[in-house]
Amino acid sequence: LGNLHLAAAQLAPAIRREGDPALDSTASLLDQSYYRLLRLVNNLTAAGELGQDAPLPVRDRDLTETVRAVCAGAQGLFALKKVQLEFRSAADCHTCAFHQPSIELLLYQLLSNALKFTPAGGAVTVELKFINRWVRLSVSDTGCGIQEDQIPFLFDRYLHDDAMAPQPHGLGLGLPICQHIAERHGGTMIAESRPGQGSRFTLSLPDRRCGTADVSDVKFDYNGGFNPLLLALADALPPQAFSQRHLD
């Protein structure tokens, strides 16, 4: 897949795309397809780990900053669909033990679902609360909601219902992956929803420290040369999100 993306980049290099809107529009459709395919491959890889139950290698980190950074990076992309993204936290900073790559992946999955099912003019809210030695991270939306009889099966692998997945891509792996991440942290995932009234997904994590502090090394996120935020939201974004100015 990386080789195909490289070949397309050679046929439509960035400097030409910046000066040719028609070429950029056509190349954006190709990039959108590449990102969706890579996201699917990554989800299939993560799904292969669903049977593992060993605890994740957590570190003491600032969870508020981690969530805030993801939301800040996503706001411009949400604006392309005219959906408001808001982040709220009960504390400006809060250190606890968690595996940062996994929590970022979980949040990406929840944001992607919320954006996918929220129409223009709607809103998505990410909220952090700290209650009775538990951390509550919730993502709520004003989207179409979910039928009550579907909620017990949301975290089942490969669930694919027409009412829940109107777009012709995805295998229903995102929520099972989220639940698995929660369980490997010693936490839980719950879903609340009503048709026409939106949905809320809440991650609950033990609010504790492990005694091993985060080491702020330079972070290297490979992702095959792809923009990690575009990759995470690829299923929910319109083609213009993959124009050259967003890829840079």
Predicted regions and their residues:
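Short helix-loop "hinge" at the ATP-lid/N-box region of the Bergerat-fold HATPase_c
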Residues: 114-115
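Short alpha-helical segment of the dimerization/phosphotransfer core of two-component systems
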Residues: 32-37
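Short flexible loop/turn segments at helix-to-beta-strand junctions
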Residues: 21-22, 51-61, 65-66, 97
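Conserved catalytic submotifs in the C-terminal HATPase_c
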Residues: 59-60, 79, 84-94
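Glycine-rich G1-box
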Residues: 76, 144-145
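Short conserved segment of the HATPase_c
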Residues: 146-158
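Conserved glycine-rich
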Residues: 186-187
